């Protein structure tokens, strides 16, 4: 009796259909792919390779670094404001869990080498107009225990349905990468005999070329599919050269659950300047190309002019009788001539030097490029004439950095979405308790245990013998800058010194200081208010102690005149009930 194999949900036919959808997505993204390749050349100052300019043919192709300098400064601003997450609970019952998450999330990010991911993504965001990060679960990490992995993604190798603004609304999402065919066959034996690559992917241009003859395109296919109950599940399939390597629908443990419980594509897009009907945006290179091209052409013409003006050339008649080889050889002191020379047959050829208006025009185009990119001299530490006061320079730098602050806000919003994905992966995969080393409030190392059970639905209790079901903890992510720029630190320190000099922290001035703080706004103001309130409360308690001690004094002894001057620390602590705690 023949055994009929059960047909798997995902097989060669489904993969062929997915490949056809991928080709359609590639056609809709062709213009964006061409722009990405072109922008990479611009960033490497090799953009003349894409232009067949008759003026440049056979001549040096100068590429000044004004565009590169603008992008490098934007990247430096981003690294000066490296983000840090703060988890806030939406219910009082989850406050302790939120406090623990605020401590361990930076550790998870550090273990995932997030600072390098953050840097690489910012380079791509500035060059290509969009930074993309992938938040995945790596089941092979830590010897099979598994861990969260965050990777910078190459926008050139990502595909979605044309016309959507949010990738989560795309029915399919494809992530491609090139891998060595032999290594793939070793890991997945079913690939043997299918080494011919059936997909072509766009690639960046390299000076030495890129040999892809021994590589195959591996496709990570994510798609959303409703189940019998109407829930939309996220499924995942990895295939190469038409062969299924893994499919979550073929996995009995995930077929009815989905690959990730959060049901979202594990990619976060962060566009620099948004475009309609696309999750990808455009970057600074796209808006600075024309100006940089004009500067390069003027530099080329000016370089040619300087070389011609500095080199002596001559106009010779055929009847001049001058030995041209001896004339061109600058080491010869004597040049032989046949016959007589005259101005009509031999004269120097003069080349006009650069005009002042030409230099002024080129400088104006350079200033235009700086203005377009928001990369004024003041943002790099330079100042205008007559500005010497430190406060004035700081004010100019702060006013000139508003474009950087705007970019950082969009990056922080993307970072918050990444943190939400991390929490969802913790909820799904942190089955075993893990121990994280954190820095405590006093600066000492603490070891905090944590598992996904703290994030999963908790019993809501009973009322009148009726169970209220379960409640899943929900949190909010607030992002702040962990690494601040030198100016931000100096500004914060100056604010603290001014508050101290004005007597904000004097206990007797607590009420007036709180009134002033109500009209102020700066980072960390809540901590300052809390400290001022504590100082005011301490002053009131000391005043009450003073009155009590004065009333109990024996006649003839001097009265205590000050709340903090004549009252000993021990007596104050004992009277306030702190003595027992300190023993």
Report residues per predicted region.
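Acidic/polar low-complexity segments with low predicted structural confidence
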Residues: 280, 284-288
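Extended, helix-rich architectural segments
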Residues: 1-256, 319, 353, 357, ...
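A broad, low-specificity signal for short, low-complexity segments enriched in glycine/proline
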Residues: 91-98, 195-199, 256-258, 273-277, ...
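C-terminal anchoring/interaction modules
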Residues: 1-59, 125, 133, 139-143, ...
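Hydrophobic/aromatic interaction determinants used to assemble and anchor large protein complexes
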Residues: 248, 253, 258-267, 280
């Amino acid at each position: 009796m023949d055994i009929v194999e059960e047909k798997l949900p995902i097989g060669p036919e489904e993969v062929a259909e997915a490949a056809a959808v991928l080709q359609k997505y590639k056609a809709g993204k062709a213009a964006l792919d061409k722009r990405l390749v072109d922008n990479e050349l611009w960033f490497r100052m090799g953009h003349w390779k894409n232009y067949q300019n008759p003026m440049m043919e056979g001549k040096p192709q100068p590429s000044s670094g004004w565009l590169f300098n603008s992008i490098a400064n934007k990247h430096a601003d981003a690294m000066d404001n490296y983000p840090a997450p703060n988890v806030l609970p939406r219910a009082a019952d989850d406050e302790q869990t939120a406090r623990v998450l605020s401590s361990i999330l930076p550790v998870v990010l550090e273990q995932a080498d997030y600072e390098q991911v953050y840097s690489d993504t910012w380079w791509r965001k500035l060059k290509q107009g969009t930074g993309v990060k992938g938040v995945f679960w790596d089941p092979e990490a830590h010897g099979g225990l598994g861990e969260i992995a965050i990777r910078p993604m190459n926008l050139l190798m990502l595909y979605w349905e044309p016309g959507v603004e949010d990738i989560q609304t795309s029915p399919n999402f494809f992530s491609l990468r090139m891998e060595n065919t032999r290594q793939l066959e070793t890991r997945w034996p079913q690939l043997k005999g299918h080494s011919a690559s059936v997909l072509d992917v766009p690639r960046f241009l390299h000076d030495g070329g890129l040999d892809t003859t021994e590589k195959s395109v591996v496709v990570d296919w994510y798609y959303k599919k409703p189940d019998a109950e109407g829930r939309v599940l996220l499924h995942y399939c990895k295939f190469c050269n038409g062969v299924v390597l893994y499919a979550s629908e073929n996995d009995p443990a995930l077929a009815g659950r989905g690959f990730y419980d959060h049901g979202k594509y594990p990619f976060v897009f962060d566009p620099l300047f948004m475009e309609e009907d696309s999750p990808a945006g455009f970057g600074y290179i796209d808006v600075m190309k024309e100006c940089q091209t004009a500067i390069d052409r003027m530099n080329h013409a000016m370089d040619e002019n300087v070389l011609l003006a500095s080199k002596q050339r001559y106009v010779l008649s055929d009847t001049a009788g001058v030995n041209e080889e001896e004339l061109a050889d600058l080491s010869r002191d004597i040049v032989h001539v046949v016959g007589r020379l005259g101005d009509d047959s031999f004269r120097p050829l003069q080349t006009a030097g650069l005009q002042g208006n030409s230099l002024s025009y080129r400088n104006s185009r350079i200033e235009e490029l700086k203005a377009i990119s928001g990369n004024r001299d003041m943002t790099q530490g330079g100042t205008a004439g007559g500005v010497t006061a430190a406060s004035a320079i700081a004010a100019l730098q702060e006013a000139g950095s508003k474009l950087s602050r705007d970019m950082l806000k969009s990056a922080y919003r993307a970072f918050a979405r990444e943190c939400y994905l991390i929490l969802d992966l913790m909820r799904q995969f942190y089955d075993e308790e893990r121990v994280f080393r954190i820095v405590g409030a006093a600066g000492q190392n603490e070891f905090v245990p944590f598992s996904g059970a703290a994030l999963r639905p908790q019993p809501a209790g009973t009322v009148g013998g009726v169970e209220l079901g379960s409640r899943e903890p929900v949190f909010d992510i607030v992002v702040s800058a962990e690494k601040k720029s030198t100016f931000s630190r100096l500004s914060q320190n100056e604010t603290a010194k001014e508050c101290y000099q004005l007597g904000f922290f004097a206990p007797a001035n607590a009420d007036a200081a709180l009134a002033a703080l109500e009209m102020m706004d700066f980072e960390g103001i809540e901590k300052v208010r809390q400290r001022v309130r504590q100082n005011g409360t301490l002053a009131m308690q000391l005043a009450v102690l003073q009155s009590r001690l004065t009333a109990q004094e024996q006649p003839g002894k001097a009265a205590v005149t000050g709340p903090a001057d004549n009252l000993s620390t021990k007596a104050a602590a004992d009277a306030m009930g702190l003595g027992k705690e300190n023993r």
